[in-house]
Amino acid sequence: MQRILLVEDHASFRQTLAYIFDGEPDFEVVAQAGSLAEARRTAVGVGADLGVIDLTLPDGEGVELIRDLREANGDFAALILTASVDKTEHARAVEAGAAGVVHKSADVDEILDATRRLAAGETLLSQQEIVELLRLAGQVREEEREAQASIGQITPREREVLQTLAEGLSNKEIAARLHMSVDTERTHMMNILNKLGVHSRLQALIFAARYGLVELK
């Protein structure tokens, strides 16, 4: 009997999965959770053999949970459930120790088959797929490092310029809001573009929003 930790933020989907797993002779759902914090609490002491874990949770990512659980128990097996087709997200899950990724649109038999294969010690990915995903994860980490280095160069005044840009203000409006000349505003913007390695105000705004430099209202 394989003991399952089921982590999924949509209660109805989670309850359906639990009903399906508990109806199988070789599975038992020993703990359920709808968030990262709840999963960390409920996972303690239940002795789960494997986890069926949502990639995106309200208060974090399934990747964080997998990493924690595998650090505590190197034999813990994890299957990621996701609605995403973004390979970079899959790559991060595999790098954290997930043995496979199944889309939420998969039918019941596919989810059960994937879980049984996982319980048998199989991985759901070929060696080539694993290598490609790990390579992609490395590229993502490098991009993150470069982004953080760029962010570190942005001055408080330049952050103010970015924030007013996020509010949809024009050059003149930004200058007026921040009590500077239009030429000074343009100089700040040029410095921002250079530091972030982008070529337009729109690209700067996208970068700033992605990495939390601005608050979008």
How would you label these PLM feature ranges?
Residues 8:
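Conserved acidic carboxylate
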Residues 32-50:
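Acidic, metal-coordinating helix/loop segments flanking the phosphotransfer/catalytic sites
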Residues 35, 61-64:
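Acidic catalytic/metal-coordinating carboxylates
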Residues 54-56, 82:
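Active-site residues of response regulator receiver
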Residues 63-75:
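Short amphipathic alpha-helix used as the core "switch/output" element in two-component signaling
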Residues 83-85, 183:
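Short, conserved "switch-loop" micro-motifs in signal-transduction and mechanochemical regulators
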Residues 90-95, 100-152, 156, 160, ...:
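Short, flexible helix-to-coil linker/hinge segments that flank and couple to helix-turn-helix
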Residues 168-203:
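Recognition helix of helix-turn-helix DNA-binding domains
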